[in-house]
Amino acid sequence: GSEMCIRDRNGAQKVYAVDVGYGQLDWKLRGDPRVVCMERTNARYLTHEQIPQELDFASVDVSFISLGLILPALDGLLSPEGEAVCLVKPQFEAGREKVGKKGVVRDPAVHLEVLEAFLRHAKENHFTVLGITYSPIRGPEGNIEYLGYLRHGQGTPGDFSLPEIVEASHSQLKD
């Protein structure tokens, strides 16, 4: 989905579609010469050997791994002013002891902790967080998820309040 949007709506010259799994990429995209399909590839270990040029943009939607483990690789791949949008999934960031039935994290305090950790990981890996919002679409099991907008390099962070974002997400996306 995000590959198609990046390719079609934003005029990307080349899209690297990275997935640790196999057979996930839409067949229309597989046949597109602008799309490089990198299946059975763990984004945590990506280097310039696999992706030789600096990237201007990255869309990150990972499962079963923390963004804190992905951002170091992204730091090495993005151009100096490159940007990224990361889907922050509390169920994969919070730690098992804070995840409820069916992998759902309902506690707003845990969501706040997750977003604070995301800010720390971003800064530690040379990113400025320009914005954070909640996704209007819940995850498959009903998790509230968040979108973080990053720019590579240190700069002035966006003007946002994590407690207000978490509160709004829980009031707007009630069960």
Regions found by a protein language model. Give the residues of each.
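A short glycine-rich, Lys/Arg-flanked "PGG" loop and its adjoining helix->strand segment in the class I
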Residues: 68-83
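Short alpha-helix
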Residues: 111-125
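Short, small-residue-biased leader/transition segments that mark boundaries at the very start
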Residues: 1-6
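Conserved S-adenosyl-L-methionine
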Residues: 127-136
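S-adenosyl-L-methionine
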Residues: 14-65
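Short, glycine-/aromatic-enriched active-site segment of Class I SAM-dependent methyltransferases
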Residues: 90-107
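Flexible, glycine-/basic-rich loop-and-beta segments that form/coincide
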Residues: 144, 148-175
